[in-house]
């Protein structure tokens, strides 16, 4: 009987973390994303580093601090004392999505900074959540007198007017340039809480776009593997992985993914014909 222990691969470990939405371990799942690039990464050490930051923060907290005081204390600690902020000099560096690098450099992109900030906020018993705002991830906190929306890239709170202005490029063209009050911009629709699974997916898609723009197909495929584990019915991800496999010359894997996409994709998908032609070409090549 073979009793030897085989450590899970990074993808198997990730799959175990994201298999259920009940008690989804957001911080651990996000920390594990770096294991494709840094296979020796100790995820538990990353979690421990965040716990140490929280312990330092909690020692500063007066016993009778209300929610607003806790929020101010958190922002002072995170953005001023520790100096976390956006990486404006190298925004598209993949390390901006890897928590161990963000903790070391104190620089990241909005969504990675938000994950760390939310972990600390929840440790202070603040009702904090992520917001999948178009083009720029936000965080929100529910206070007794209302909701505060914060840009984790800068630490600044945002007014309704500022949010409406940021939303304008994503509005239908006929509403662009119309005052927010006149157009009745549905801000509430864009300020809904982002589920942990959606946060991880957005981070992976950020990495996906970086690797695709650099034509780094090996790293792109590794990201696609995680996206398909995370979102097994996101058929477009099979298509994109299949196209990456085809670029790498992995015909069998490309055919499997592209045929899966064709089988499940809606008939009105605009690229059905193009993908079908590519499948035919790959079959001829493989045959």
Question: What spans do the regions from the language model cover?
Answer:
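A structural boundary/capping signal
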Residues: 1-287
């Amino acid at each position: 009987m073979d009793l030897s222990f085989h450590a899970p691969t990074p993808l198997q470990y990730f799959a175990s973390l994201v298999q259920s939405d009940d008690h989804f371990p957001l911080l651990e799942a996000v920390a594990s994303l770096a294991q494709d690039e840094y296979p020796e990464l100790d995820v538990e050490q990353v979690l421990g580093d965040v716990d140490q930051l929280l312990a330092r923060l909690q020692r500063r907290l007066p016993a009778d601090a209300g929610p607003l005081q806790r929020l101010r204390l958190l922002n002072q600690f995170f953005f001023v004392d520790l100096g976390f902020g956006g990486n404006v000099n190298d925004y598209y560096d993949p390390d901006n999505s890897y928590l161990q690098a963000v903790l070391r450099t104190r620089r990241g992109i909005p969504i990675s900074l938000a994950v760390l900030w939310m972990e600390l906020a929840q440790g202070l018993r603040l009702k904090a959540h992520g917001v999948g705002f178009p083009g720029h991830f936000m965080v929100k906190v529910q206070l007794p007198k209302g909701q505060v929306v914060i840009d984790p890239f800068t630490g600044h709170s945002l007014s309704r007017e500022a949010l409406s202005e940021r939303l304008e490029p994503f509005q239908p063209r006929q509403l662009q340039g119309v005052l927010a009050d006149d157009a009745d911009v549905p801000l509430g629709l864009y300020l809904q809480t982002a589920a942990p699974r959606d946060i991880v997916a957005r981070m992976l898609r950020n990495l996906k776009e970086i690797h695709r723009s650099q034509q780094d197909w090996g790293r792109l495929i590794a990201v696609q593997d995680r996206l398909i584990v995370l979102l097994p019915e996101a058929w477009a991800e099979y298509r994109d992985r299949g196209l990456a496999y085809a670029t790498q010359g992995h015909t069998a894997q490309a055919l499997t993914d592209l045929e899966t996409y064709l089988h499940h994709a809606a008939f009105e998908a605009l690229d059905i014909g193009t993908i079908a032609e590519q499948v035919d070409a790959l079959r001829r090549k493989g045959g």
